[in-house]
A protein has these predicted regions:
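ALDH superfamily catalytic-core signature
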Residues: 1-110, 173, 235, 240-241
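Conserved C-terminal structural/oligomerization subdomain of aldehyde/semialdehyde dehydrogenase
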Residues: 100-241
Length: 241
């Protein structure tokens, strides 16, 4: 939200999106930004990517490439097939020889754009804006429950509302991705993003079948539970209340 440290948010989102150039299941998929800080955020993102990967990112040996030509073409198509009012704030170029695509930020995106219709799994970051937190929630709930949610805010009430008011697999506050690196916390999805969780004790429990077992002695029998019941029915009903 508008209380967030915009520079830190840009640094950390650029880092998380840059891991395998967005080809991870927990990469930031889209950025929902308060309208008062969106211009600053986009500017800072552009600067961060170039700080990390140099002036010509397509020529940077540390910038990963797409897994194959099919996905290169798919992601380039998401950039090119945007609505007429959407624009490439930075990036947008691809090299079919190396299968590299520049970190690309799209602004003016609508929920009907192809880039919002699938998991991107590439270095494209659409930016949507909101005015109120309720409006932001409505946008998030348009989609299936995500595997990860990242909230950047210095307002603890906003953090609490996001963490308790939305459904997602796991979350990080004021950073991205790193929640899954903690082996003491479960990692997994909910609904369309997955079932169950693993890591540490949570993983042990997930892949363990706990057999419910009851052991009884044989020194006495309870005739009240055995037929014929007759007048015992009323007593049984009292005991079962």
């Amino acid at each position: 939200d508008e209380t967030a440290n915009v520079k830190r948010a840009a640094q950390r989102v650029a880092w998380g999106k840059g891991i395998n150039c967005g080809q991870t299941c927990v990469a930031p998929d889209y950025f929902l930004v308060h309208e008062n800080v969106v211009d600053d955020l986009v500017k800072q993102l552009d600067e961060c990517f170039h700080q990390y990967y140099g002036a010509d990112i397509l020529a940077c040996d540390e910038w990963p490439h797409m897994i194959n030509r099919h996905h290169f073409d798919r992601v380039m198509g998401l950039i090119e097939n945007r609505n007429p009012n959407a624009r490439v704030a930075f990036g947008g170029r691809g090299d079919a020889e190396t299968l590299r695509i520049e970190p690309t930020c799209l602004t003016g995106v609508t929920l009907d754009d192809p880039v919002m219709g699938e998991e991107i799994f590439g270095p494209v970051l659409p930016v949507l804006t909101y005015r109120t937190l309720d409006e932001a929630f409505d946008i998030v709930r348009t989609f299936e429950k995500p595997l990860a949610c990242y909230v950047f805010s210095d307002d603890k009430q906003v953090q609490h509302r996001v963490l308790t008011g939305l459904q997602f697999g796991g979350a990080t506050v004021n950073d991205v991705v790193i929640h899954l690196a903690n082996n003491h916390m479960g990692f997994g999805g909910v609904g369309n993003s997955g079932m169950g969780a693993y890591h540490g004790k949570v993983g042990f429990d997930c892949f363990t079948h706990y057999k419910s077992t009851l052991k009884k002695g044989t020194w006495i029998e309870m005739p009240i539970r055995n037929p014929p019941f007759g007048d015992k029915i009323n007593l049984l009903r009292m005991l079962m209340r």
